[in-house]
UniProtKB/Swiss-Prot annotation:
Catalytic activity line of the entry: oxaloacetate + acetyl-CoA + H2O = citrate + CoA + H(+)
Pfam families associated with the record: Citrate_synt
Keyword Transferase: yes
Name assigned to this protein: Citrate synthase
Keywords for this protein: Allosteric enzyme, Transferase, Tricarboxylic acid cycle
NCBIfam families cross-referenced by the UniProt entry: cit_synth_II, PRK14033.1
Organism: Mycolicibacterium smegmatis
GO cellular component, one term: cytosol
Quaternary structure and partners: Homohexamer.
GO molecular function: citrate (Si)-synthase activity
Family according to the record: Belongs to the citrate synthase family.
Activity-regulation annotation: Allosterically inhibited by NADH.
Anything else known: Citrate synthase is found in nearly all cells capable of oxidative metabolism.
């Protein structure tokens, strides 16, 4: 006799939409209020009042640092340099490979040269997380300058995280408003619950693989245009538009062809991304000192036209794309900047998964041919 349970087709959750697979104490996304908190703190408050180093500490330890910040910063600054073998590896990579391929390869190499790669105690994973956090800016800056035919600039131990990275990229520390806007972008991108790349990292961790493999998987997921690659696509679109006057017609063409408009909409937020107002203010401030009114006008016109036509609001990638462009970052480097930020959230989730692990192994509903004979 067939039971009701056996005869009912299972409910399929494409993309795991709406499925709650685990608990986390790291961040909370509330779609109804479009809010995001890190360890209980609203992200916009953290972006306004904290350094990226403080936020990294918060994500890893659960509390903002007080006296601990000095030692934390000292350890981070002491871990920034890359050795000659890493320098040689970066120099050998093809000039035409995507910068995300460079970052992915570099993280794999860090694991390959780590004699304790498979040691996964909480202390070991924290040390590896801090090392990746510290060295990724050096890797990204080295690759940016390599592609421009410029000599790498070594890290400066007397500069904070944001100042040091910008100095390694451009040979000087830019205007304070640019430094602060960049740091705010790092805070806003740092963590976002069980997004695709974070979930990829947790899946790999659930198999008891090493932290480098988990981060490499996350980088691969983030490279996709529907995830981290969107900030690059936003700026390419703005360059294609060219001027605010052309934005409505450009948008009409996109929508009539049923093409996705990058930088708008969100899988979780349906009524606006709470991170956008903070980053838009940062964009406006950078535009003032970097002669960026043209891009700000395109931003405002496209935002208004998109909302009027679809009622869809922008996500964080929309203001971040032109902000990074005005900071003089090459467009292809935008997603590696995302990696520099999200390494904090990824590794926090990796450590959380490892501390209370269960192998992630969902089911599927077969939709192919029924069983058949070879004869």
């Amino acid at each position: 006799m067939t039971t009701a349970t056996e005869s009912e087709a299972p409910r399929i959750h494409k993309g795991l939409a709406g499925v709650v697979v685990d608990t986390t104490a790291i961040s909370k996304v509330v779609p109804e209020t479009n809010s995001l908190t890190y360890r209980g703190y609203p992200v916009q408050d953290l972006a306004a009042q904290c350094s990226f180093e403080q936020v990294a500490y918060l994500l890893w330890h659960g509390e903002l640092p007080t006296d601990q910040l000095a030692l934390f910063s000292q350890r981070e600054r002491a871990s920034r340099r890359i050795d000659r073998s890493m320098q040689a590896l970066l120099a050998k990579l093809p000039d035409n490979c995507h910068p995300m391929d460079v970052v992915r390869t570099a993280i794999s190499y860090l694991g390959a040269e780590d004699l304790e790669e498979d040691v996964d105690t909480a202390e070991a994973n924290y040390a590896k997380s801090l090392r990746m956090f510290a060295v990724l800016p050096t890797i990204v800056a080295t690759d940016i300058r390599r592609r421009q035919g410029l000599t790498p600039i070594p890290p400066h131990s007397q500069l904070g995280y944001a100042q040091n990275f910008l100095n390694m990229c451009f040979g000087e520390v830019p205007e304070p408003v640019v430094v602060r806007a960049f740091e705010q972008s790092m805070v806003l991108y740092a963590e976002h619950s069980f997004n695709a790349s974070t979930f990829a990292a947790r899946v790999v961790t659930s198999t008891q693989s090493d932290i480098y493999s988990a981060v490499t998987a996350a980088i691969g997921a983030l490279k996709g245009s529907l995830h981290g690659g969107a900030n690059e696509a936003v700026m390419h679109d703005m360059l294609e538009i060219g001027s605010a006057e052309k934005a409505p017609e450009w948008l009409h063409g996109k929508l009539s062809r049923k093409e996705k408009v990058m930088g708008f909409g969100h899988r979780v937020y349906k009524n606006g991304d709470s991170r956008v107002p903070t980053m838009k203010v940062a964009l406006e401030q950078v535009a003032q000192v970097r002669d960026g009114q043209r891009w700000l006008d395109i931003y405002n016109t496209l935002e208004s036209a998109m909302f009027a036509a679809t009622r869809i609001k922008p996500n964080l990638d929309f203001p971040t794309g032109p902000a990074y462009y005005l900071m003089d970052f090459p467009i292809e480097s935008f997603t590696p900047l995302f990696v520099m930020s999200r390494i904090t959230g990824w590794t926090a989730h990796i450590m959380e998964q490892a501390a209370s692990n269960a192998l992630i192994r969902p089911l599927s509903e077969y939709s192919g041919q029924p069983q058949r004979s070879l004869v």
